[in-house]
């Protein structure tokens, strides 16, 4: 009914106070046959004079029970699944338009509720209690109970609220809703949820009004939390609950009502984001969610993100929200393939800026780790992994228990679970008290270096680097174990893996520089000399991260081996200077003459690289190594092989690569001729051999823009 009795009374401009609580209650009890008297609960409001035009309205409120007593059974009662949205979302049957009797009675109940609340507007909490008493009396007169008609009352309010004027009528409607929610929060939530999907302006305002009422907002939030978890409810129920939570949590001060179940609510929202990310895109969900969107959320995922932001901000976690925005965490949370990365970023931000909730989160996570629901289990695993960065939180469980759980994940067939386990082992390695667990950590981390999934290899490299940062790190053991495993990763096809592997080598050299300075011929020295050529060539890597990581690692090697070549290394890295590279090769040939054949063999392999800058860099490096090598250092077979490969490279489609190969081939030919010259008696060799002319290479077209200014290097040194 459009506006109900309230709409008619407003049309006649009758004052809202025309009816009093006493008049209503006495009229109801008189029709029920009870003795008249004052209401038993709440303060006695001041008696107002009842105007004559109010009497027909009072009669209209109770007319259904007298005129058609049989129609009382047509009011729908709460079923066994009051929160189900299936029936609410079904289209209405076709046929001639009629106003159902149940809708008419809902309107009458809503009229009574609105009038009563308006009369009690000044009575505060006592007025709310009196509102409930009056509604109960009205229903008892018809042989019904209030708890059975909450759905009907809320539906009636939803029908009449759009036609109410701002001010006292609107406040009366909100008071009725609060009065019902105080005693019947679950029924009110279940009745409002169908109007939240799709979004409804009236329902949104009612959710916000419940949020502002500190007596009921906690109960309503709890019911929405259970609806969001929705283990037995359909999916639309969780979506509607997400939108309702977004409306309520956006109200200032509402987050305080979540005390006691804040971690539970946060995990439920993040898990809901995981479910939304894994489900097919709904029609209202954009393919790309933009953080700059303003106004109402454009999708269920963005609505959940806004609810999560409001939950964090309302509890003083504004820095968590800011960190997530700067790191792109919110965008990752809504992505199907990046959700767990977003969870890890959220956990890291909370460890840094919201540690007062970590204990509660950790306790709520533990039972979820064994959940049969994949989104819930994986989200809990990611949170568990991220929270291990907090030492006080990690101490809530025994070290052995955490380690056993993480190692168990390494045997899971799902790569994502193994990846999370490796990340957890990396966080565990940062704890200085885990020295005795190194022998257990290492096999799992080293074994992951052979995985095909880039996430697993990257996590293992990161964990090994963290392990090296610990005091008393097992440098010699790691050097021996990484000897056969690390060099292949320096040439991995994945940019991130190359950069991480080179960085791990640099960290290893920095931690073991004491033994290297003493000249110890251990596994670390062997590993560095084996990796020297890849590091020099990776200075020209198309990936900036890999190139910068190589430069940093070579600087660590220069410091540990006392080469005195830092200026040359920086000049080669940023200016691709042939003069600096020539000086560098001369020093290496003088320091390690026995390794020159290995250097040349390694460089020869890069002549077949699919990357143009690396092919040219390899040709140039061969030219300078051959130029500075003595004839007796290189055998004829190696020279022949180099000459053949450089000859094939002279037909390279890139002119710069072909030109460099031509110059280096000439150097190989000159070294071969010098090696083949007859030596003669020692006394007759008075005149020195003629010096071989140095190679001259053109400037590289692949040179990147230099950032050498931050190193304090003004430019290449010219001869």
From Swiss-Prot:
The keyword Membrane does not apply. GO terms for cellular component: cytoplasm. Coiled coil: none annotated. The gene is MROH6. Keywords: Repeat. PANTHER family: MAESTRO HEAT-LIKE REPEAT-CONTAINING PROTEIN FAMILY MEMBER 6, MAESTRO-RELATED HEAT DOMAIN-CONTAINING. SUPFAM superfamilies: ARM repeat (SSF48371). This is Maestro heat-like repeat-containing protein family member 6. Residues 25-103 are annotated as: Disordered. It comes from Homo sapiens (Human). Gene3D superfamilies: Leucine-rich Repeat Variant (1.25.10.10). It comes from the Eukaryota. InterPro entries: ARM-like, ARM-type_fold, HEAT_Maestro, Maestro-like_HEAT, Maestro_heat-like_prot. HEAT repeats lie at residues 356-393, 397-434, 436-473, 477-514, 527-563, 594-631, 633-674. Signal peptide: none annotated. The keyword Repeat applies.
């Amino acid at each position: 009914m459009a506006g109900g009795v309230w709409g008619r009374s407003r049309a006649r401009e009758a004052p809202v106070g025309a009816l009093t609580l006493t008049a209503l209650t006495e009229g109801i009890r008189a029709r029920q046959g009870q003795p008249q008297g004052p209401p038993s609960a709440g303060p006695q409001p001041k008696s107002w004079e009842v105007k004559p035009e109010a009497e027909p309205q009072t009669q209209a409120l109770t007319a259904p029970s007298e005129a058609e007593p049989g129609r009382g059974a047509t009011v729908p009662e709460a079923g066994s699944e009051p929160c189900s949205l299936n029936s609410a979302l079904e289209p209405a049957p076709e046929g001639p338009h009629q106003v159902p009797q149940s809708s008419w009675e809902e309107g009458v109940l809503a009229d009574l509720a609105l009038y009563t609340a308006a009369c009690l507007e000044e009575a505060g909490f006592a007025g709310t209690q009196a509102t409930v008493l009056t509604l109960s009396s009205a229903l008892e007169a018809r042989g019904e109970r209030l708890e059975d008609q909450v759905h009907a009352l809320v539906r009636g309010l939803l029908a009449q609220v759009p036609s109410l004027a701002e001010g006292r009528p609107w406040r009366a409607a909100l008071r009725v809703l609060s009065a019902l929610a105080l005693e019947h929060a679950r029924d009110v939530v279940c009745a409002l949820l169908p109007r939240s999907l799709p979004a409804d302006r009236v329902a949104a305002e009612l959710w916000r009004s419940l949020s502002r009422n500190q007596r009921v907002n906690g109960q309503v939030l709890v019911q929405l939390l259970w609806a969001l978890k929705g283990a037995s409810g359909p999916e639309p129920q969780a979506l509607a609950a997400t939108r309702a939570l977004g409306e309520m949590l956006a109200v200032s001060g509402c987050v305080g009502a979540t005390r006691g179940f804040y971690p539970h609510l946060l995990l439920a929202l993040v898990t809901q984001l995981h479910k939304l990310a894994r489900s097919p895109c709904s029609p209202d969900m954009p393919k790309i969610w933009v953080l700059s969107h303003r106004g109402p959320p454009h999708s269920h995922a963005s609505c959940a993100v806004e609810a999560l932001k409001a939950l964090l901000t309302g509890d003083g976690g504004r820095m968590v929200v800011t960190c997530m925005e700067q790191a792109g965490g919110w965008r990752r949370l809504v992505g199907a393939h990046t959700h767990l990365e977003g969870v890890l970023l959220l956990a890291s931000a909370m460890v840094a800026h919201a540690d007062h909730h970590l204990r509660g989160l950790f306790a709520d996570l533990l039972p979820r780790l064994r959940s049969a629901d994949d989104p819930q289990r994986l989200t809990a695993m990611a949170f568990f992994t991220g929270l291990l960065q907090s030492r006080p939180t990690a101490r809530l469980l025994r070290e052995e228990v955490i380690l056993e759980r993480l190692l168990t994940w390494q045997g899971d067939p799902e790569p994502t679970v193994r990846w999370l386990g490796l990340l957890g082992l990396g966080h565990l390695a940062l704890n200085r008290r885990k020295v005795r667990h190194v022998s257990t950590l290492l096999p799992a981390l080293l074994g992951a270096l052979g995985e095909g999934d880039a996430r697993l290899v990257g996590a293992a490299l990161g964990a090994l680097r963290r392990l090296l940062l610990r005091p008393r790190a097992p440098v010699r053991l790691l050097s021996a174990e990484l000897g056969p495993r690390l060099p292949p990763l320096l040439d991995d096809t994945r940019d991130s893996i190359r950069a991480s592997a080179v960085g791990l080598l640099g960290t290893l050299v920095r931690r073991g520089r004491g033994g290297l300075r003493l000249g110890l011929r251990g596994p670390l020295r062997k590993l560095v000399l084996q990796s020297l050529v890849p590091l020099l060539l990776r200075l020209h890597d198309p990936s900036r991260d890999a190139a910068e990581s190589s430069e940093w690692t070579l600087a660590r090697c220069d410091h540990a081996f006392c080469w005195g070549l830092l200026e040359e290394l920086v000049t080669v890295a940023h200016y691709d200077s042939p003069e600096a590279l020539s000086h560098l090769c001369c020093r290496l040939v003088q320091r390690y003459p026995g390794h020159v054949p290995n250097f040349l063999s390694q460089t020869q392999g890069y002549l077949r690289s699919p990357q143009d800058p690396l092919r040219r860099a390899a040709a140039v490096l061969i030219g300078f190594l051959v130029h500075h090598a003595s004839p007796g250092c290189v055998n004829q077979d190696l020279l022949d092989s180099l000459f053949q490969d450089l000859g094939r490279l002279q037909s390279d489609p890139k002119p710069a690569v072909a030109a460099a190969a031509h110059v280096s081939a000439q150097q190989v030919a000159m070294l071969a001729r010098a090696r083949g010259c007859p030596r003669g008696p020692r006394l007759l060799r008075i005149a020195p051999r003629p010096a071989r002319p140095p190679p001259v290479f053109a400037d590289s077209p692949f040179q990147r823009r230099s950032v050498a200014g931050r190193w304090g290097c003004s430019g290449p040194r010219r001869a």
